[in-house]
Amino acid sequence: MSDYKSTLNLPETEFPMRGNLAQREPEMLKSWTEKKLYQKIRESRTGAKPFILHDGPPYANGSIHIGHSVNKILKDIIIKSKTLSGFDAPYIPGWDCHGLPIELKVEQKVGKPGQKVSAAEFRQKCREYAAAQVDGQREDFIRLGVLGDWQNPYLTMNFDTEANIVRSLAKVIDNGHLHKGVKPVHWCTDCGSALAEAEVEYEDKTSPAIDVAFVAVDQAAVLAKFGLEQSDAEVATVIWTTTPWTLPANRGLSMAGDIDYDLVEFTKDGSKRAIIVAQELVESCIERYGAELHSVLGTVKGQALELLRFKHPFYDFDVPVIIGDHVTVDSGTGVVHTAPGHGQDDFVIGQKYGLEVANPVGDNGVYKPDTEFFAGQHVFKANDNVVALLEEKGALLNHVAYRHSYPHCWRHKTPIIFRATPQWFISMDQKGLRTQSLSEIEKTQWIPDWGQSRIEKMVENRPDWCISRQRTWGVPITLFVHRDTEELHPDSVALMERVAHRIEQEGIQAWWDLDAAELLGEEADQYRKVTDTLDVWYDSGSTFSSVVAARPEYNGHPVDLYLEGSDQHRGWFMSSLMISTAMNGKAPYKQVLTHGFTVDGQGRKMSKSIGNVIAPLQVTNKLGADILRLWVAATDYSGEMTVSDEILKRSADAYRRIRNTARFLLANLNGFDPVNDTVAIEDMVALDRWVVRRAAALQAEILEAYEQYNFHLVTQKLMQFCSVELGSFYLDIIKDRQYTAKRDSLARRSCQSALFLIAEAMVRWIAPILSFTADEVWQSLPGEREEFVFTQTWFEGLVSVTLDSDLSDDYWANLITVRDEVNKAIEQARREQRVGGSLEAEVTIYADEALTESLALLGDELRFVLLTSNTQIAPLANAGDDAVETELAGLKLLVDKTEAAKCDRCWHHREDVGQVEAHPLLCTRCVTNIEGDGEVRQFA
C-alpha cells in the first residue's frame, strides 16, 4: 500500500471557513421568522423565573444610528444570556410616538394644524407618519439579530397605552402631586411651547454682557447704612447680566446677606459716581468701567441693605434689594438682576418677597403690545435696543460681547428663554416626592455605580416638573377646570377614568371630540376642558405602568433592568423614577445600566458635517451584523465607545479567530456520534481531561461576566481561550492524535469527546453575542438536538474533574511555558535554515532537577506536546555552549536536525520507519494504528 491518505481521519465539515455574513444573515433571519423562533423561546420558558428588561422607547423618527444599535444589541445580549440562564426573559420593543419632532415633519407636508388642515386631521397624519417610521426602524433593528416581539411592540400612540398614560396621571393627581402655577419654564419660541429639562442642550452663544446702574430712591437712607451723611456723587448699585432683554421684567436686586458690600466712589470722564458692589469684585468692576480714581467710602453686609429701593433704569417705578442664597461673588458685581418671570432662582426669591411675576413676552418670543419701548420686538433682536436705551438714560457702565454656554432647544438648535407661563407641574416637595425619590435611588443598583451620585444630584437640584405642553400631537391632560376659581373638578380622578375608557376605544382624539356635557351634565357650563398635552417624557416615563403592568407577558412582575445611554439620567430614568414614586411610592426598576456614547477613532462625536458617521446598516451590509455585535460586546460600554472602520476591521479579525476555532472543532467531530462514541471524562487522556477542566473553569468565568453585564470580559476570555489554550496549545497538539490514531480508538474518541464538550459549551457562550454564527454552528454539531440554540440553557456537560496531583493545572500551565520556549528555539533554527519544520527537529532539553522530574512524567508522549519527532531530557549541567538560553529559569535547549527517516503517513521522523516489511514507508506507530489495536495514549 503506497497511498495512506484513506487511513487518516481527515477533518471534514460543511461549516464554511468564510462567514459571508452579509449574505447569509438575511437568509437566517427569514428562517427564524418562518419558524417562529421568538415564540419558541417563549414557550421553552413557560413557568420559569421571570427577568424583565423594559425597553426604553426610541423616538419614531428617522433612521437608526450607531447609538441605537449599541443600545439594542446590549439589550439583546442580556435577554439571550438570561434565557440561557433559565429565565423567562421576554423582550417587547417600544417606540415613543408623540411630540414635537413628528409634528414638525408633518407640518412640512400638510401645514400647521388649524390652517390648511384641522387639528383632528393633523393628529391622524402624525399617527400615520409615526407608524411608517416604526416600520422602517423595526426592519433595521431586526437586521441586527435582535430577537423580540417585533410584530406586537408597544407604541405610546397605541390607544390602550394612551389610555393608560391618562390613568397614570390620574393616580399621580389622586396622590396629591399635581399643581398648577405660573412659573418660569424653559420655553422655545420656535416650538411655541415649554420644554422639559431633557429637551434642553447647552451650546456656546455670544451675548451682550452689560453692567447697569440702578440709582438710589432715597440717597440719604442708603448713605446712612454706610455711616455717611452725604456724598457729592449720585449713589447707585450695579448689576451685571448677559440677558438685557429681561430688564423690562426686573422687579428686584438680589444681594447675599453675609457678603461685604463696598460703597465705592470713582471718577470717569471728569464726573463722579458712587456705586455699591461686592467687596471681592471692586477691583474687577473698576477696571471694567475704566475708572480713573476710586476710593471706598464704607462697607456693610448685604443684609443691612435689605429692602432699600432703587429706581428701574428706564421705567418709572422702583425695586427693592432682596437677600438670596443664590448670589455669589464668582463674577459680575455681587448684585443680581432679578426678574421673577424669567428665571427659577428669581422666581423663588421673588415669591419670598412677594414680587410681581412680570411676563412681558409672548409665546413667540415677541414683547407684548403693552411693553413700553419694546412692543412687537423679538427678545433677542431687542437686546441692542435695550443697551441703546440704557446708554441714553446714563445707566450703562459697560458693554462687551460675552461667549458663554447657553440653553438651546434640542430640536431647533436655537437659544431658548425662561418665561413664566401658566403650566401644570408635578411638585417635588408638596408631598415629599424629592425625599422619597432620593430614598428609592439608594435602593436601586446603578451600573456603573457613578450613576447613583449623578441622578441624586439631579433630583436634589431639580425644580418642579412642568408636564404640560401647548402642542397638538400628544396625550391630553384630561382635566376640567372651574371657569371662575381655576380649581380642578372635585371628581377629576373618576372623570379621567371615564375619559381613558373612551381613549382606549378611539385614541386621544376622543378628548378633543368630547362634549363636556357628556360627562359633566348640567355642570358643563361651569368648567372648561384643559387643552394642554403631556410632556412626551411623561409618555415614556409612565410605560412601567402603561405597558409593563398591562402586558400579559410580564404577568405583573416588576422590572428588573432599565438600560439606556448615559444621557437618560436626566431623561427616561428620571421621568420613570418621578412618576413611579409619585404613583406607587417606589422606583420602577431594580437595576439601571448606562452605556456611553459612540465616538470616532479620534474621540469625536458622530457628525454628518465632519463626515465620520458610521451607519449600522452600512456595517451589516458590508461585514455582517455579527461583526457589529462583537464590537459592541468587546467594548467597555461604561465610557465612550470608540468605533471606526479600522476598529471594525479588528473586530472582523477577532471574529475570524472564533469562527476558525469553531470550524476546527466541527471538522474534527466528523464521524463522531455523541451517544455511542463519548468517552467519560475520567477515562480521557490526561490532556483532554485538562482542557475540559479549563473549559469548565472558563464557563464559570463567562457566566459570571454575563451575570455582571461585563460583556467585554466575555469576549476577552473567549479570545484568550481560542488563541492560547486552544489555538496555540491544545488544538495544535491533538492534530496528530486526531488524524493518525485508529478511528475508534480510545485515544481518538477521547479527543473527540473533549472537542464535543467544548463545542457544545462554546456555541452557547457565543450565542448572546454572535447570534447568527452560533445558530450556524448549532446546525452543524453532531447528534440529535432541538432546533435552536436560543432555547437551550448553559451546557452542563462540562464537569470540572479533579486532575491527577502530578498533572495539576499548574503542571499544564508550566508545560505551556516550556512549549513556548521550544517553539522559539525551533523557529530560530528554521530561520537559520537548520531545520525545515518542527517535525524535522530533535530537541534536547537541558533542565534542572525539578523540571526534569516534571517533564519526565509524560515519557515518550512529551514529543507530541512539543510537536517534535524526538525529544530527550538531559541534566542542565550537561548543556554545552551551543545550547540556547531561555527565559525560563532552569531550562536550556538544543535543536538539531534529525537523521531519522520520515514516515509517509504521520510525517514524524523515526528510527523505526520501515521495520514492518509490509509497510516500508511507515513507522511502527502508524502500522499499529492501521492494522493493530491502535496506539495507546495516556497523557497527550
From Swiss-Prot:
Is Transmembrane found in the keyword set?
Answer: no
Q: How is the cofactor bound?
A: Binds 1 zinc ion per subunit.
Q: Enumerate the subcellular locations listed in this protein's record, separating them with semicolons.
A: Cytoplasm
Residues holding ATP: 608
- Where the record places motif 'KMSKS' region is 605-609
| Location of the motif 'HIGH' region | 58-68
Write one Gene Ontology MF term.
zinc ion binding
Residues binding Zn(2+) are 903, 906, 923, 926
Tell me which GO cellular component terms the UniProt record holds.
cytosol
Amino-acid positions noted as binding L-isoleucyl-5'-AMP in the UniProt annotation, renumbered to this chain: 564
Cited CDD domains: Anticodon_Ia_Ile_BEm (cd07960), IleRS_core (cd00818)
| Its EC number(s) | 6.1.1.5
Q: Which cofactor does it need?
A: Zn(2+)
Tell me a GO biological process for this protein. isoleucyl-tRNA aminoacylation
Query: Which reaction is catalysed here?
Result: tRNA(Ile) + L-isoleucine + ATP = L-isoleucyl-tRNA(Ile) + AMP + diphosphate
Q: Which UniProt keywords apply?
A: Aminoacyl-tRNA synthetase, ATP-binding, Cytoplasm, Ligase, Metal-binding, Nucleotide-binding, Protein biosynthesis, Zinc
Under the heading NCBIfam families, the entry gives:
ileS
Q: What does this protein do?
A: Catalyzes the attachment of isoleucine to tRNA(Ile). As IleRS can inadvertently accommodate and process structurally similar amino acids such as valine, to avoid such errors it has two additional distinct tRNA(Ile)-dependent editing activities. One activity is designated as 'pretransfer' editing and involves the hydrolysis of activated Val-AMP. The other activity is designated 'posttransfer' editing and involves deacylation of mischarged Val-tRNA(Ile).
Q: How does it assemble?
A: Monomer.
How are the domains described in the entry? Answer: IleRS has two distinct active sites: one for aminoacylation and one for editing. The misactivated valine is translocated from the active site to the editing site, which sterically excludes the correctly activated isoleucine. The single editing site contains two valyl binding pockets, one specific for each substrate (Val-AMP or Val-tRNA(Ile)).
This chain's protein is named Isoleucine--tRNA ligase
